């Protein structure tokens, strides 16, 4: 008895699953088997074999009649008599008859005196052909199942009424289900599982067909290499080859199509080729490609993917509802949920649209030649064509614009034309051109580049945040991080500004016609016009109009206008022009290190009398020249004693030199300060701009000489000397004549 002792319980389980034998008294008409706890009771075993010799049928009662259980009972008696299994005392209750030599699974319901016994597998007709001489290792179960198999038919498994009834010499077939593989006779290597699967097949050779499911492949006659899984899957195929279909009614209309793959309920449900055709269609997902009739070379993966396509060719759709409205469009690629969701060409059209991402190109109707990659990329486009879009929500507002390139999150996200327009905008980078609405022919490369532009035209910007504040400016070129970053025209304006270099022209707001080339070139100018700065830090202060600075740091402190600084460091402290700040209308050539200036021809200096006024005879001549003190000397410039990093702030008046930086070459000239004394003595240089030959730089730190101005003075001196000589000659002649 089952109790608390583990070993006893395990022993009871083992005995219950064991094989028991019980002998019937010779020629007995009745027999009782009792299921009890005794270890020697065979009736407690699941498998019972009755033995003994009988001369008539014997009724066996299994007690008690209140116990519900299942037994596998074998009639192992001799004498060819039946045994009849009962449980209740009511002779009218159902019993099970087991012929001599047979085994049956019987169920006892334990209902007391009226208990019934059922044949658990009553519908099965079991025959073991291995006991006959027909074929080798065949198994058949069912009415007429495999009943035609001959000695040449081997290794067949046939289960089900009328299954494989025509098989004679076919090998290696599996037919399970009513009328499964019913017609095939002499060929093998087929698997048919399900009601009437492969029912009509009668191939001319090894078919290698696999059909699993209600009426799967039921119409196939001589089609080969098909794999069909699911109720009514491929149930119309007759001669089609190499098809794979899985799911209810998948590929259920086609008759002669080959090389199709349909996985999912109703996938490729309507495909039907009336002539032998290699469709090369692949549909995976519920209703995917369900409307395809004669379209070929389509790949449709996802629920409802391409489910409206009828005769379109060469399409690829991956994702739920991808390309789900188009009927006749061709050569489209839609990857992502709802990608190309509404595209619909009613006539055969090579769309060449590619959309990859959630709802990418979801609203395209008839636009063509679009490439859209990224979630919601180009998702409002309807008829626009030849757009290239990569990035989340890039070009996500436009519906009819064409020829746009938007690469990066939100690139050209606001562009939207009311009428068909070739925008020819290119925006590459995070938020590049994100605010452009109707601007055209802009090229914007870099994160946040031109991200405030709305209606601007013909702008080129490249580099992080270049041209990032302007809304309506036109014809600007900004190349470099932060170039023209603050330019902003609130009305349509052709700026014609060009800035190349990191933060070149960074502070320009409304200035126009400026050219800045070099990192930080012109980076503080805001409203200057016609400024040209070429070189690192050239004209890097907020300068007025018309300045030109060419060279590293050329004129970097200038705020005045119409100056020209040519050469590295020109117009800075220590250069010939000094540190130019508020200067105007000046030219500075080179820096303090220049030793020679070479030119092929003479300078031509403007001197048209029509452009002059207030003429007065020069009164400085021979006496002035005679007072000059010419010298030979070597340069020992104060700026040489200052480090590069201090030159912008040093006061040259505080510098003394000790000869350690003097040049080794000889020069000739005057001391400007001595000449200035002579000029003042002659009545000049009393007020600003009344000097003759000396000049103090704008910062007041360096004197210079304008040697070309000595020409009129020397001419005057020669004239005075000539007059004196003439007078002297006249006196000499008078004396000689006296």
Go through each PLM region and give its residues:
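Exposed extracellular interaction/assembly regions and N-terminal maturation sites
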Residues: 1-83
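Glycine-rich, acidic and aromatic/proline-enriched surface loops and short helix-turn segments
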Residues: 627-630, 672-687
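C-terminal intramolecular chaperone/auto-processing assembly modules
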Residues: 124, 681, 686-738
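Fibrous stalk/shaft segments of extracellular and virion attachment machinery
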Residues: 1-20, 61-63, 84-86, 92, ...
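Acidic, glycine-rich loop-and-strand cores that form catalytic or ligand-binding grooves
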Residues: 621-637, 642-652, 656-658
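Acidic, glycine/polar-enriched metal-coordinating patches/loops
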Residues: 51-125
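Glycine- and small/polar-enriched repetitive beta-structure motifs of secreted/surface proteins
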Residues: 125-607
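Extracellular receptor-binding modules and their adjoining Ser/Thr/Gly/Asp/Asn-rich linkers
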Residues: 8-13, 17, 21-24, 102-117, ...
